From Swiss-Prot:
Any coiled-coil regions, as ranges: none
Alphabetical list of Pfam families matching this protein: SecB (PF02556)
Summary of subunit composition and partner proteins: Homotetramer, a dimer of dimers. One homotetramer interacts with 1 SecA dimer.
Keywords (A to Z) from UniProt: Chaperone, Cytoplasm, Protein transport, Translocation, Transport
InterPro entries, per database record: SecB (IPR003708), SecB-like_sf (IPR035958)
Protein name listed in UniProt: Protein-export protein SecB
Lineage of the species this protein comes from: Bacteria, Pseudomonadati, Pseudomonadota, Gammaproteobacteria, Enterobacterales
BP GO annotations: protein folding; protein tetramerization; protein transport
Family, as annotated: Belongs to the SecB family.
Organism in which the protein naturally occurs: Pectobacterium carotovorum subsp. carotovorum (strain PC1)
Length: 156
């Protein structure tokens, strides 16, 4: 048997924590006098770093911007972090775990934090829909592959 077959996958959540929070309502109180028909923009980003053998930090950054016309009603950003033990996998499987599986675990915590901040700002309730991090990760891989193909084509 090869050594790879003897290695079992290990996954454990060590800690989930809020790394950074920001809430701004730059046009308050004037924005409260307007009819609430906001345009809501959601931006997501993930980053991961290896802390030790098989131990990784994954940070999910969720930014929500609500605008009324040209004015920003509020801007809310949460960086939700997690420390995970991930062993027995490498390459694309590890990248998928850190880029999709772990952010999927972190998102409900970030969503709850954003909902709470928006509510404390006395804005109407904001319900963020679930995010398909697997699809986002697959799109990212496809863009990377297309980018490499274009770079190789230019070098030829």
């Amino acid at each position: 048997m090869s050594e790879q077959n003897n290695t079992e996958m290990a996954f454990q959540i060590q800690r989930i924590y809020t790394k950074d929070i920001s809430f701004e309502a730059p046009n308050a109180p004037q924005v409260f006098q307007q009819e609430w028909q906001p345009e809501v923009k959601l931006d997501l980003d993930t980053a991961s770093s290896q802390l030790a053998d098989d131990i990784y930090e994954v940070v999910l950054r969720v930014t929500v911007t609500a605008s009324l016309g040209e004015e920003t009603a509020f801007l809310c950003e949460v960086q939700q972090g997690g420390i995970f033990t991930v062993g027995g996998i490498e390459g694309t499987q590890l990248a998928h775990c850190l880029g999709a599986y772990c952010p999927n675990i972190l998102f409900p915590y970030a969503r709850e934090c954003i909902t709470s901040l928006v509510s404390r700002g006395t804005f109407p309730q904001l319900n963020l829909a679930p995010v398909n991090f697997d699809a986002l990760f697959m799109n990212y891989l496809q863009q990377q592959t297309e980018g490499e193909g274009a770079a190789q084509h230019q070098d030829a």
